Amino acid sequence: FIIRKKYDLASQRRRFVESMVDGKLLSIGYAYLIDLVNKGHLSTFFTTNFDDLLQEAFYQFSAKRPIMCAHDSSVQSISITSTRPKIIKLHGDYLFDDIKSTLRETESLEQNIKEKLIQFCKEFGLIVIGYSGNDRSIMDVIEFLTKQDNYLSNGLYWCLREGDEVNSTLEKLLWRDRVYPIFVDGFDEFFAATHNGIVSGGLGIESNLNQPKIKKTVGFMMSDSHGLFKDKIIKKELDRLKSMDRQIEISNFITDISSDKDVSSSLPISDYRNLLEIGSFIAKKDFKKAKNLAEDDFNQSSSDTAKPQYLLKLISL
């Protein structure tokens, strides 16, 4: 209602939604989700979101490339037996002007998309997370499916958070057979717990930490802007990634020094150790301590070979 009242034209609404999703970074829940796909536990996603975070997660954390459908005309070509991951946008994509962003628009679901949702629910169960059930078009389909014996035979699992407002339609739905309310702390915590229960070991993304985009994403995760460190599973994984990132930084530093034979062979052992110590503080993001140490070591060093190395560290800081 608010979007339609403020933006009359579909193109205006698209630009508004685009401005809201632009520059968003992936939270750790996406990494867990994609790893479940990589391990063969998930494959198909129906989403009401306009953003491209799910697609971006595949590009960062998987070698698999998903089939993405944001138009009614394109969804017919999706095969239920295809092994490729599938993303079907129920209300469109923000890149196109025909996104369904108003109440009137979301009251209807395109026929081909509706049929594809029904088709998949005949073969598979359904996990619903991050969705309030306020779109009549989608809820009508789900209500219909829960009344059919040969659909959702593997169950419908609806994730809720404590304190969520449950509308009357959803409340009635949760009382149906094969429909199970699941209380979760949030998107990230749910996929962390699911991953922990199904997959042994961590996320396995440390080998890509040298890639700038992944490094930026992991750095955002480690900033804990969403307060996820209180979750034991997530904290353990982020601590592990932080340790791996530190080891990679130190390894890169050693490689950089070792690659210059003239420098590495002529560095006094004390300066070599000092530079390693500075590198370790940089890896820990303790830039103040690294800077102070580099300045002190520069002033105390008597090596003409080492001094430029200290200056390079100071410049990088």
Residue ranges and their predicted role:
Residues I2-R65, I99-T102:
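Metabolite-binding pocket within alpha/beta catalytic cores that recognizes anionic/polar moieties
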Residues G23-S27, T106-E110, D135:
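A conditional alpha-helix N-cap/helix-loop micro-motif detector
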Residues N38-S43, F61-P66, Q76-T83, K114-S316:
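SIR2/sirtuin-family catalytic core signature
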Residues T47, H91, L160:
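Short beta-strand/turn micro-motifs composed of small residues
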Residues F50, G92, Y131:
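Active-site metal-binding loops of divalent metal-dependent hydrolases
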Residues H71-D72:
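Phosphate-binding loop that captures ATP/GTP phosphates
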Residues T81, P85-G92:
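Class I SAM-dependent methyltransferase SAM-binding "motif I" and its flanking Rossmann-like core
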Residues G92-I113:
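A short, charged helix-loop
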